[in-house]
Amino acid sequence: HYFGAIPTRVMAFMKDLEYECLKLGIPVKTRHNEVAPNQFELAPVYEEANLANDHNQLLMTIMDKIARRHQFRVLLHEKPFKGINGSGKHNNWSLGTDTGVNLFGTGKTASENLQFITFLVNAVSAVYKYNGLLKASIMSATNAHRLGANEAPPAIISAFLGSQVSACLLYTSDAA
């Protein structure tokens, strides 16, 4: 049951995993049940792309190691069972310059906010316009088994902006 109580054995595994991640400098958050039976979520916190890739590889290795200590097995396949939700393998990303400027970061001045809005609108437009190309470049064959609706993995690529950014864009469009 989504967001239900996590079974005691699983909670012990997750706490051990989070502790190992902390010791290794892998920033993680989120701990909850997923929709599919015996599926649980742990989310790495965003960081610089190369470091995030290294941390994801290390995370998958230690997940397997700690799972075995708890007499579990970890399935990292996107859709291990036909017709049952799998891992959506969400990908959250941002863009930055070589000097560390976050191009999707809001600013303190009108020109800094204009930069944010410009990059945001173009990124969302690209997700809409090049949806098929994005899917072809990021979906493995096994992650292409879509269930549709709100089931993981979904049949769509979406851009969730949150209420504050959505309100900012609405205000900007109304002011124009």
Model segments located where?
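Flexible glycine/proline-rich, aromatic-decorated loop/lid segments
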Residues: 83, 87-99
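Short, conserved phosphate-binding/catalytic loop or strand-edge motifs used
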Residues: 34-42, 87-89
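Helical (often loop-to-helix) elements that flank the catalytic cores of nucleotide-handling enzymes
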Residues: 51-68, 95-127
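Conserved small/polar residues in nucleotide/adenosyl-binding loops
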Residues: 171-176
